[in-house]
Amino acid sequence: MLLDDPARPRAQAPGRGRIVILQPRRVAARAVAARVAWERHCPLGSEVGYQIRFDDRTSLGTRICFVTEGILLRWLQDDPDLSDIAAVIFDEFHERNLLSDVALALAKRLQQTRRPDLKIVVMSATLEAAPVAGYLGGCPVLVSEGKAFPVEIRHLDLPDDRPISEQAGEAVARIVEAGDPGDILVFMPGMAEINATLGACRAARLTEPLAMIPLHGDLPPEEQDLAFAPSRLRKLIVSTNVAETSVTIDGVVHVIDSGLARVARYDAERGLGTLLLEPISRASADQRAGRAGRTAPGVCHRLWTESGHLNRAERNTPEIQRSDLAEVVLLLHSLGIADATRFDWLDQPDPQSVARAEKLLRTLGAIREEVPPSAIGDGRRRPDGTDRTDPTDPTDPTDPTDQTDGTIRHPQSPIRNSDLSPIGWKMLRLPMHPRYSRMLVEASRLGCIPAAALCAALVSGRDLLARLGRDDKHISEARELFEASAESDFFTLMRAFQFARNSHFNVEQCRRYGVHAQIARQVQQTFEQILQLAGRDLKETPAEPPTRGDDALPRCLMAGFIDQLCRRRDQGTLDCDLTEGRSGALARESVVYNAPLFVAASIREISSRAGPVTLLGLATAVKREWIEETFPSQVTAAIEHLFDRTHRRVSAVKLIRFQDLVLHHEHQPAVDPAAAGRCLAQAYSKDYFELPQFNHEIRQTSARLNLAAAVMPELELPPVDAAAITLCLGRAFSGLTLVKEAQAAPLRDAFVDFLGRDRLEWLNEVAPAAIPWLGEKKLKLLYPEETRDEDARPNSPEANVKLHEIFRLKEHPQICEGRLPVRLWLCAPDGKRLESTLNWPAFKAAVYPKLKPALQKKYPANVWI
């Protein structure tokens, strides 16, 4: 419809007015492009093509281009107006991928500003259309029933606790034994389950030979194509959710659905990413079932019960609400969008995730802390910090044709209100997580791009080395040949990868050393891709002589993972401290067990008998001097006073910190008297020692003042809270360094001076420690430390009185100028509490007559009026 629109101009340069169709996965982009090219009777790459990462099948004449979301975002960096694109179609939008939400928001922004002619289409078979239509300004909603065949849904009668691969293998066997024709598509959550399912089917001795084909995103294109190619045998395709949407596999009439998927989630509070095995939503289950009805009536076998189906979530959680947002926030900063929480999203991201991403980017040095007016106000500086003085410079943002609404005109030109640093602009050119791009930017400076690219490839996928059990001692001993350096666990991985490559990724040879041959092959592919990217977008510059050689790669790893800097607590432990008050334990298999400082590329949480443990892996030893040279603005030195709990004294120490993590300390010969006093006071507030002289009288004075402040708010009295007491003690302890000195200090006088004698005299009037009582006696009051009760009403002070002695009392005692009654606890002659009252006359008239008979009987020696 869009391609053949008569209003669409045709007399234009090749490539102008293209239609771009976004697909959530590379497999889908390739497969759908091939299908559409076949339907349009044109070679793939001519009128219809696709472009995915490292694979471009387009030409100047391509009018329909299928791409993944990352490609469109890359185009937006290079050409923020998308000047050669007429329409952007978001296919399978119900999956709510992170980059699809970003791309839609940016496309909408572009349409509302400089490209009102840009057409935006959002498509899905299961999407709830109304919210999206409203987000796009109330756009029309078109419904097409399409051509689909009926699909019978079959659930389990009872839950099955067996491994999901075993259940799937049994379901395949039933289909084959029943003689039901048609290809079989099995959905599994990951590669391990795919291999287990194929193994179960091979072991089942099926009565019919099947073409068993795995399908997942890590396979090379030629192996993925086997799932779509004709076969003389019935096909059994075992796939991840790459086959859930977009692609049609001709001949599939049976779907076996595990109902599971691996979902990436990000814990913004702890900064940990996890890959969790979770039940899919009902919408995803419907999509999977639909694969059985594309070319003929089919059957979907769900490996869960019908009642269990109703308990599943209706739709997927948008990825933007559960993902690490660092890469997206970097992109938005490049477009002049400094606050992602105020951007016009379809669904708002978690503010805590945005804040975590911002902090990471600032830590990596991608965002300027403070941008001088000369850098962004008039746009006269390049990303490398040099001035633009040539008025004919084609990248000059002050060119009259440039826009001034916060968008980029050139991929390397800073924009008004953009606060990316020169490092940030370089990172932006590398489509990968900012940790890896920062590592490669540093590698370009130090002259070790290939080694850094290999490290990025090793850490960006699954584990290369198998986790060893108790029975794998022979593998552990054989693997020792990889551990030739105690500088970095990456060196171990690099040697293991080199071994796999030298053995031509032979599965049996790799298995003997606990190396995953298939993963090593994927590392090789990723390494080549990253190397190609880095070679295109980064210029390797010769390193300074002192930083060449053995230090170069560890420095790069430090640059990329500096926010995960760890300090060993002492030489005899694996326990470590990290920034932001975090802690963890170095993995026992790490070779970096002697390093006092290291960065951890892997942080994961495991369960133990003592509770959750944060495990620090893929460690690289670093030096304090490297941190100071690479991140000078984040390293501080200050003399601080610390309390030594062992020796019960205060010491002055010079602390060198990266952010809040102590890197080094040096004891100082002298202490500052006031600082030492404050340190002792803070130690007391943390219950590190006791103060016998901080007695009941002082505590009661604090409680009296706080209660008066609560009852008489118009006086605006400052409360005596924990902070005030710490301040008072700090003054009292000035010049002291030992606990025994603090315990001998005259605290009562210090407390009186702190509060002021005038205030204490006033306090004795409105909230006295004791009140006149029945003549010359004084009645002591006990003031509560909590000034208000559960209903936020002021808590009255209390006093114990003997019931038989107060019949002469005419008026109930009150404090705070009559605003608050005293709570009288009426006691028996032996002192036992009977009742409490806030109104003695009312109690005497209404309640006492009911108590009197029992009191007369129990205490006959006393007079009961």
Language-model regions, residue ranges each:
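P-loop NTPase motor module signature
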Residues: 1-370, 417-439, 446, 585, ...
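Long, charged, glycine-rich C-terminal linkers/tails
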Residues: 46-52, 215, 557, 574, ...
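Extended active-site and interfacial segments that coordinate phosphate-rich ligands
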Residues: 79-94, 258-266, 271, 275, ...
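Second RecA-like catalytic domain
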Residues: 209, 214, 256, 264, ...
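Extended, non-globular interaction scaffolds
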Residues: 218, 392-398
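Intrinsic, low-complexity polybasic segments
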Residues: 370-384
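A positional "C-terminalness" feature that preferentially activates on distal terminal regions of long
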Residues: 533-570, 589, 632, 642-865
